[in-house]
Amino acid sequence: MPAHVTPRTEDARRGAGPSSACGCSWFCHLRPVEDPASPSVCLAAVATMHGTSRTSATSVNADCCIPAGLRLGPVPGTFKLGKYLSDRREPGPKKKVRMVRGELVDESGGSPLEWIGLIRAARNPQEQTLEAIADLPGGQIFYRALRDVQPGEELTVWYSNSLAQWFDIPTTATPTHDEKGEERYICWYCWRTFRYPNSLKAHLRFHCVLSGGGGRAFLPQEHAARPGASPVAEGLGLPPKPTVPDLTAPVQAIALRPQAPAAQLAQACGARESIKREASLAPLATSPPPGKWGTPKKGKEQPDRAHSQFLGIVGGSSGGGGGLPFYPGVRSAFKPAGLARAAAQSDPYREEGGGKGPGLALGRLLGGGRAGGRPGSGESPAGHHHHHHHAHHHHHHHPKCLLAGEPPPAGLPCPGALRAFPLLAGHPEEASAFKHVERAPPAAATTSLPSARYAALPAPGLPVERCALQPLDGGSLKAYPGGGGGGECSPLPAVMPAFTVYSGDLLYGPPAAYYPLKLHLGGLLKYPESISYLSGPAAAAAAAAAAAAAAAAIGPAELGSLASIDREIAMHTQQLSEMAAGKSRARLDSGTLPPAVVAATGPGGGGGGGSAAGKPKTGHLCLYCGKLYSRKYGLKIHMRTHTGYKPLKCKVCLRPFGDPSNLNKHIRLHAEGNTPYRCEFCGKVLVRRRDLERHVKSRHPGQSLMAKAGDGPGPEPSYALEPGDPKSEDSDVDVCFTDDQSDPEAGGRGEHDS
């Protein structure tokens, strides 16, 4: 926040910037800031939305039709889109913009640079009209129209998927449903509830202290320009810092005019070398005091709850160890349990501990990740490095590029071409509040891995299978100890390059350019039958052997050692499904299947109970009690027993019901001419003979059902035939792999009908 507010700054904050302020306002952010206490109009407007003020509720509305694909920007200043986003829209003045000679201007003729900071963040994709994009990682940020914006519609913006991954913003959010069936989005760290998905994403990134996002959200120089930073590195907050950090130096703007390609190349090389010199000091320096750097001490005590699905790769070099954090995949607010476990096992950077070595050899990490200490323990060589890196950057965004300790050789070229290859698509997750899970018998978990099929790779292995880097010209090269590949593996350079993931592409390269990285991620990606960039069948077999060795290095005991179930693990469907499968297997072994399941799997159902025990069970899992339902509708009705939601009512007595079958049976009690069954032991009236038999068995054990049930009608078919009756409204709804005593819908159904 500026020290004092000038009239121009106040006008910009209210969205009524003077018309004379912008003869060349498109480039007002290009001039150096001579007086930090009185910023320009456009910088004040951007600071209003992203960093300093909550009072302004000015919105930007379209006064005419805005075509799809129109670009606005670049966005100047510190970019913190969504920092003050909430579910509620505060009313306020509206700034109308219209197209004039192909350019979007406001009522006073001001260019987008004056009011682009007033565009509010979108709460959900339905109301979003613009998306924030960047052409290159670290490039300038623009707004692009997603569709044709109609007159009177508000302009709202949110991150594109590639930009969200770069800024550590979750890209997906799975809704849950409250007792009224309305969608809600819950933060499983602090238990806050939101109505819109983007509100949850912004909360996780900027405000949730338990998830680690709140401590890095209020930094005055985050993503700010620094002297000597390259144009590529300024927009997304990856500028090289001086060797001696100075957090009190005023932020100065730099020229962003297009430069010659040669000048950009030399400047990028200098920026990369500056980052490298800073990284080389990280393992040697001690942790600075919290008062100087502002790093909260509780950051060391936070549990391993990493939302980012990234993999820490440590490369040993000739001159010393250096960390190479690598961020594959999409950062989701609700991560599948399989990926969470894989990231926790292969992610030494998220754990704290005292470093005992310069670095972990990449070959050992690829071979099983056991030589450098178990991740999560104090033996991890990367623990100290990550702690210092976390404090050194003052909780900035995790840098997507970090070079190793040694500078490149003098003869190392710096080509300017930017190349990449797209990552292979992974297994899609169902966007549903009730996840579909599949459980197999215990024997299926120990089957051998095929040697030539990538599609059959096990999910719970070390995500790295094989890493082959393109040989760099100049400098000494060395090969890593292969995991069964012999001489088929490409050599690794002595100076490890930088890594980055942007827009679905995995990039690496020397200090001046990125190159494609050939990397296979076991369990995270689904491979096709053949991969063209593997060097022949021998290399494919070597990669499969390395994957099998990595999977075999993790024993069943380690895979089964899960933490105690808390609020976060309650959303991990794989862990809960394992618990439910264990209960189901125990019931199968003890022969205590419910009658409905026994009848369905009997001679009339196409198989006996023994054959059902060897078949994998698929279904929908209840996250409250662990029951497994064969159909989603059955789980939906069952969930009402936990939430107490009863949307159905009897039209005669207005009694509420949550299960339609219970309501149908209750209505039959009011029907004339349909005399129900009556229990001769307690006088309870029931609708069907099946209900009477179940009632006698559960409430009057040891008693036998009489042939004549009260004043009921003639005898009905035996109990064993009724589960297959097409008129049945109970068992045909769904099959639950539980016993009657633990099922409130089955065992306690008699009480519901009273």
Swiss-Prot record:
Expressed in the brain, hypothalamus, and embryonic nose and brain tissues. A zinc finger (C2H2-type) spans 185-207, 620-642, 648-670, 677-700. Its EC number is 2.1.1.-. Residues 355-376 have a biased composition (Gly residues). One of its GO terms (biological process) is GABAergic neuron differentiation. It holds the Pfam family zf-C2H2. This is PR domain zinc finger protein 13.
